[in-house]
Amino acid sequence: MDIPPSISESIVIERSPEDLYDMVSDVTRMGEWSPECKACWWNEGDGPKVGAWFSGRNEVPERTWETKSQIVAASRGEEFVFVVGGNYVRWGYSFTPVTGGTQVTESWQVLPDMIKLLEERMGSGAEAQLANRVEAARTGIPATLAALKQVAESA
């Protein structure tokens, strides 16, 4: 397979970077805005700090699965980043003050271990599965950001 894909999108939300960080870093709220991740809960650690682990349950029409993720960056009002499965996928949120609120950027990057895992488990079907996940991120990120904006600006 080619170089692992990455996707990012941004939106401006009429809230402070700190408020938005607090919302996003409370992973137990992820199901409020994600079209795929329906629930998250803390496994280890006491919340959004580097090294803490949490699990999530994802649902799409074809299947339901759980993941385990570790926080790798947590700077209030600046960035919140976690890696799924040890080293499979990197999800990140950055918060930049702008006129009218905060620009929130959500990013998603497939890491090399995910490519290896897909090739080992799916063989010739790996590229199709990767394309499926890329499309889910491509459509899911804007939907997540729009829902986050709606929830944040309604609070």
Q: Which residues does each predicted region cover?
A:
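A generic helix-loop boundary/linker signal
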Residues: 10, 44, 61, 127-131, ...
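Solvent-exposed residues in well-ordered beta-strands and their adjoining turns
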Residues: 12-16, 59-61, 96-98, 107-111, ...
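Hydrophobic ligand-binding cavity/cleft-lining segments
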Residues: 1-49
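Beta-strand/loop substructures that line and gate deep hydrophobic ligand-binding cavities in soluble
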Residues: 83-139, 148
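Short amphipathic alpha-helical segments with heptad-repeat character
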Residues: 14-17, 21, 131, 135-138, ...
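Residue-level detector of alpha-helix boundaries and kinks
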Residues: 5, 15, 56, 126, ...
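Glycine-rich portal/gate segments that line the openings of hydrophobic small-molecule binding cavities
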Residues: 41-90, 98-103, 139-155
